[in-house]
Amino acid sequence: MSKCSRKKYIKTNLRQMTMDTMESQQDGSVTDSVAENESAHMQNQTGQNSIPTLTQVSVAGSGTGRGSPAVTLVQLPSGQTVHVQGIIQTPQPSVIQSPQIQTVQVATIAETDESAESEGVIDSHKRREILSRRPSYRKILNELSSDVPGVPKIEEEKSEEEGTPPNIATMAVPTSIYQTSTGQYIAIAQGGTIQISNPGSDGVQGLQALTMTNSGAPPPGATIVQYAAQSADGTQQFFVPGSQVVVQDEETELAPSHMAAATGDMPTYQIRAPTTALPQGVVMAASPGSLHSPQQLAEEATRKRELRLMKNREAARECRRKKKEYVKCLENRVAVLENQNKTLIEELKALKDLYCHKAE
């Protein structure tokens, strides 16, 4: 289809639209200046619009009363502007001037699927990066345990393929491994053997066996731990589960005020001077954790409850006593008022009798 035939086809369609519009209008009289201004305004708008596939058709019915043709502005897809005059004139002008402009906009916007696919790829890539940067709970706990002293370190699980370290002798597998605040490692085996390592040793290497025996001299339930290792400051820190522990040092005697720092869920033991006849170099370690056992916590709660109930009973007793005193005071007041009332009644009778005798 050639360019000329396209223009003719568009003009024919526009004339048909103009005829239909003019027939549907009742009162469409406007001045020529208004039509020209509207046409110029539509030209500016069509010049600013950058959509190539946009076609605007403006139909303005204009007439000053007689012989004023309708002006139609057409913008072609190539950017050309065509003015088309209507053939049908307005039959009768109206006093009311109501300009009516009909704008038909046809826009075609093609959206490709490539943008959506690229956004989905970017979102999945960002999600994978966030998940890869997110630290694990074990890593966070290891960092916390390395920064804060006295918190047990969480050892990574070793594979079964790794062999036994050469510095560790053949011994029973320990059930619990703990680390003190000075860097020593303490392992408690199933048979009751305690193994302690020096602060300079690597991991659990260099563990030294400690003999733990029971003795009849200390109080029942206590445990004697004998060890020959000695640290730089002459003290040892270890953990033994139980309520009371007796520690014996073969080389140096522990200070009575020495505190064995505990980590994890193990109780804290405070070394104190023995109260019984124990061998020289043996001191008693009492666990303050036993003071906060569930049984004692329950007893403490029961004691507080009983104390509160006792205070409530005392307050109620005092309230009842004051109420009784108040009632008794009111009863005494009523009795006094009754006596006064009787006295006044007797005086009134006496005065009446006296008045009657005088009247006679």
From Swiss-Prot:
Region of interest: Disordered: 20-52
Region (Basic motif): 303-328
Residues bearing the modification Phosphoserine: S118, S145, S287, S290, S293
Post-translational modifications: Stimulated by phosphorylation. Phosphorylated on Ser-118 by TSSK4 in vitro.
Keyword Cell wall biogenesis/degradation among UniProt keywords: no
Subunit structure: Binds DNA as a dimer. Interacts with FHL5. Interacts with CDC34. May interact with TSSK4.
Entry protein name: cAMP-responsive element modulator
Pfam families according to UniProt: bZIP_1, pKID
Organism listed in the record: Canis lupus familiaris
Sorted UniProt keywords: Activator, DNA-binding, Nucleus, Phosphoprotein, Repressor, Transcription, Transcription regulation
Sample GO molecular function, one term: DNA-binding transcription factor activity, RNA polymerase II-specific
Gene Ontology cellular component list: ATF4-CREB1 transcription factor complex
Gene: CREM
Family, similarity comment: Belongs to the bZIP family.
SUPFAM superfamilies xrefs: Leucine zipper domain
Every KID domain range: 104-163
Biological processes annotated in GO: regulation of transcription by RNA polymerase II
InterPro entries, A to Z: bZIP (IPR004827), bZIP_sf (IPR046347), CREB1-like_pKID (IPR003102), Leuzip_CREB (IPR001630)
Summary of the function given for this chain in its UniProt record: Transcriptional regulator that binds the cAMP response element (CRE), a sequence present in many viral and cellular promoters. Isoforms are either transcriptional activators or repressors. Isoform Tau is a transcriptional activator. Plays a role in spermatogenesis and is involved in spermatid maturation.
Region feature (Leucine-zipper): 330-351
Subcellular location: Nucleus
UniProt domain bZIP: residue ranges: 302-360
